[in-house]
Structure formats: structure tokens, C-alpha cells
Swiss-Prot record:
The chain crosses the membrane at residues 119-137, 170-188, 191-213, 260-278, 331-342, 354-377, 386-408, 416-439. Pathway: Xenobiotic degradation; phthalate degradation. Pfam families: MFS_1. PANTHER family: PERMEASE-RELATED, TRANSPORTER, PUTATIVE (AFU_ORTHOLOGUE AFUA_6G08340)-RELATED. Belongs to the major facilitator superfamily. Phthalate permease family. It is a multi-pass membrane protein. This is Phthalate transporter. It comes from the Bacteria. GO terms for biological process: phthalate catabolic process. GO terms for cellular component: plasma membrane. The keyword Hydrolase does not apply. It is found in: Cell membrane.
């Protein structure tokens, strides 16, 4: 859409009542975000259940903390980088086919991990899983830009990210319950049942995606013409004043030449750093306080996720109302950095340790909700995909290095103290980079209603 056409959409949008616009977006959110929420819960169960399975995998497959995390992240990361570019094809083949393919493959591969018997099979399974899952996260972020203008994006992204919290809240007790009650059922070990029962639903959900999702508002049969017009006008008004890129061959290169893309990549890298502690080490940290019952560990592991979910909703709402991103991101990150630095000094107290994990969860969920609302605010439609892809790919450095480093440090020193302190410092540095290097006037967002 041209700049003139986008500008013409603004008065059309203003002629409609605030209540009518909100009603349309509630309808869109109920339809799309319910499905995406459940899909992401199933996706993130894989990250939660591996933290509970690691005790059994180390025993049955003969791997140390360092070996388990280094090899797993190495093969996962390499194929993730290959597959991460696939989400750009979402614009060509559509969200329905893309999400269907990703979910069916990851569900089947995740369930197949129940039948691995050697470390090599574990590495292969994780590599294939990384390739299958690649593109889901950035693809969904891009998909949301087809439906929601910038002023709504942090809040709607936070609802999407609530699925991660839900996966932690559900996954901990569920994994603990399966590991407790499925010991030697039908001749299979408890961790085998966990992978099967938590993997296959994703494949089923993938098939459902083909029949349930549509690629863009124009194709939605569940919207009438006026509702479609409201959404399209809101998106057009959001694009008003942005410089269009007409040469698609150079659109991605234009995004990669923007130094703010690399600053945001550094900021995004801090999020998986926090996620490493929360998603992979929470059960271990809780067990180290003296709590050994796997079901109790699972129940207590939900506390940080609950706190993080509540904080994310409040942070995202505040950010959207004020149309301010940088400070919200920084203070979210700083809170988690403090929690990571304090955690090594309170390992004997379950209550204080869980409090520190909750602080990290606030950082993890709050920062993730904010940072993905920044790129679309200053990148036009054609370069947004390139910018989001670059940020996601470069930010995976944090996701790649953190588990390896923590695993190695824990194996060598017998403690997570040094690793947690280093992560706290890196997280704070990433937050400061976004706050200082991204100009506030670069985030050209406009409120679309009087909210």
C-alpha cells in the first residue's frame, strides 16, 4: 500500500467508534490467539520436559551436564540456523501451510525421542527437532504483524508469550506426574512416556492448523466486510509515514545494514539467557535446596512462571498505553539480572531461591514481550521480515552459549554460582545496549484509538 493510501485510511479509522474497533479485535484475538496460545504451549513443553528428563537421561544414556547440553545445543543450534530462514517463506506459502508443517514434524520427532537408546540417537533427535521447530517463533511474530498494528503489538505478543508461562505452569506438574506414575508401564520407562504424551498432541494440532488458520484478514470467512475493513485500515494507518521499500531484492539487506538490528539482537540474546536458567535449571536449583520429590519439584517450579506471567501482562500493558519500549525493556532485564546475581548466594533457602527465579521470570517474559514490538515500529513491511530474521538468528547466540557454559561450569566446579553471575552481568549489558543505542524517536508508533 502506498503512503497516500495508508494516510487516507486514517480518517476512515477515526470515523469508527472505539467500542466497534475493540469488538473486532476481541473477535480476532479470540479466534487466532487461542489457537496460537495452545500451539505454543505444546511447543514449549519440549523445553520444560527436557529439564525434568535430564536426570534420567544422564543415567540411561551416560552423559554429564556439560556433554548433555553441549551436544544438544550444538546440533540443535546448527539446524535451527538453517531452518530459521524458512519462516520468510511464510509470506509466499502462507501461515497455514507453514505452521502445519512445523507442528506436525516437531510433534512426531519429539515423541520419537522416547525410543532413543544411545547418546548419538539423542543428538540426532535434537538436531532434527531444531530443524523442525525453526521458524515457528519468528514466523508467528511476523504473522501477528498481518493482523495487529504497532500500538497493540506488545500486549498481543505478551498474550502469545503467556503460553510459555503456561507451559511452565502446566509442564512442571505434568512432567512430574508422568515421571511418578508411568514407571515401567507397558515395559517402558517414565521418561519415554513423557516424550510420547507431550509430543504427539503437537502433531495433532498441526493438522488442525491447516483447517483453522487463514493467512491474512482478507481471507477470513469469519469476518464480515466491515470487520475486515477495520483491520486493514488500522494496519494502513500504522504504516502511514513510513518509507516504503520497492526493491524487494534489497529489502533484507537494508534491514541488515541498520545497526539497530544488531543492538536489538544483543538485547534479544539476553532473553534466552534468562530462559536458560528458568527453563533448564529450575528443577535442579529447587532440588539443590533439599527438595527431592519429583512431583513437589514440579509443583514448586510453577511459581516463577506464574509470577512472570502476571508481570508480563502488566509490563506489556504499560508499554502499549505509554507507547514506550526501551525503558520498559531495560527495567525488566535489570530485575532479572539482579535475581541471577543473587541466586548463587541463597541456594540453601527454597523460598529465597524461588523468589530469585521469579525475578528472572519477570525479566524473561517482560523483556520478550517488549523487544518484539520494537522492530516492526521502525522497519517497513518489506524489510521487517529481514530484520526480525536477523535479530532472531543473531540472538540465538545467547540460546546456544548459555546452556553449554552453565553445564560446563556446573560440571567443573560443582556449582552454578559463577555461571549465574556471568549471565546476570551479560543480561544487564544487553538491556543497557537497547536503552542507550536505540533512539526513542526511531520507534514511530501511533495510538490508533483513544485508549
Amino acid at each position: 500500500m502506498t503512503t497516500t493510501a495508508a494516510t487516507d485510511a486514517v480518517p476512515h479509522l477515526l470515523q469508527r467508534s472505539h467500542e466497534r474497533i475493540e469488538k473486532v479485535y476481541r473477535k480476532v484475538t479470540l479466534r487466532l490467539m487461542t489457537f496460537i496460545f495452545v500451539a505454543w504451549v505444546l511447543n514449549y513443553l519440549d523445553r520444560v520436559n527436557i529439564s525434568f528428563a535430564q536426570v534420567y537421561l544422564k543415567h540411561d544414556l551416560g552423559m554429564s551436564d556439560a556433554d548433555l547440553r553441549t551436544r544438544r545445543k550444538l546440533v540443535f543450534h546448527r539446524l535451527h540456523r538453517i531452518g530459521n530462514t524458512q519462516y520468510a517463506y511464510l509470506q509466499k506459502i502462507g501461515a497455514r501451510l507453514t505452521i502445519t508443517r512445523i507442528m506436525v514434524l516437531w510433534g512426531l520427532i519429539s515423541a520419537s525421542m522416547a525410543f532413543m537408546t544411545t547418546p548419538t540417537e539423542f543428538y540426532i533427535a535434537r538436531a532434527l527437532l531444531g530443524a523442525a521447530e525453526a521458524g515457528f517463533w519468528p514466523g508467528i511474530i511476523l504473522y501477528l504483524t498481518y493482523w495487529y498494528p504497532g500500538a497493540r503489538r506488545a500486549r498481543i505478543t505478551s498474550r502469545f508469550l503467556l503460553a510459555i508461562a503456561a507451559a511452565g505452569i502446566i509442564g512442571g506438574p505434568l512432567s512430574g506426574w508422568i515421571l511418578t506414575h508411568f514407571v515401567d508401564v507397558m515395559g517402558m520407562k517414565n521418561w519415554q512416556w513423557m516424550f510420547i504424551l507431550e509430543g504427539l498432541p503437537a502433531a495433532v494440532m498441526g493438522v488442525m492448523a491447516y483447517f483453522y488458520l487463514v493467512d491474512k484478514p482478507e481471507q477470513a470467512k469469519w469476518l464480515d466486510d466491515e470487520e475486515k475493513s477495520i483491520i486493514l485500515d488500522a494496519l494502513a494507518a500504522d504504516r502511514a509515514g513510513k518509507k516504503p521499500v520497492t526493491d524487494k531484492r534489497h529489502a533484507v539487506l537494508a534491514a541488515l545494514k541498520d545497526p539497530r538490528v544488531y543492538v536489538l539482537a544483543a538485547g534479544w540474546a539476553t532473553v534466552p539467557l534468562c530462559g536458560t536458567i528458568l527453563n533448564y535449571w529450575t528443577p535442579t536449583i529447587i532440588r539443590n535446596t533439599g527438595i527431592q520429590d519429583v512431583l513437589h519439584v514440579g509443583l514448586l517450579s510453577t511459581v516463577p512462571y506464574i509470577v512472570g506471567a502476571i508481570a508480563m501482562i502488566l509490563i506489556a500493558r504499560s508499554s502499549d498505553i505509554r507507547l514506550e519500549r526501551r525503558k520498559h525493556f531495560f527495567f525488566s532485564i535489570a530485575f532479572g539480572a539482579l535475581g541471577a546475581c543473587l541466586l548463587p548466594h541463597v541456594v540453601d533457602s527454597a523460598i529465597i531461591s524461588i523468589t530469585c527465579l521469579a525475578m528472572i521470570a519477570v525479566s524473561y517474559f517482560g523483556a520478550a514481550a517488549i523487544i518484539w514490538s520494537i522492530p516492526p515500529a521502525y522497519l517497513n513491511d518489506e524489510s521487517a521480515a529481514g530484520g526480525i530474521s536477523a535479530i532472531s538468528s543473531l540472538g540465538q547466540i545467547g540460546a546456544f552459549c548459555a546452556p553449554i557454559g552453565l553445564g560446563w561450569i556446573n560440571t567443573v566446579t560443582g556449582s552454578l554460582a559463577i555461571g549465574l553471575t556471568i549471565i546476570g552481568a551479560l543480561v544487564l549489558a544487553g538491556g543497557m545496549a537497547v536503552l542507550i543505542a536505540v533512539p526513542a524517536n526511531a520507534l514511530s508508533e501511533k495510538p490508533l484509538t483513544d485508549e
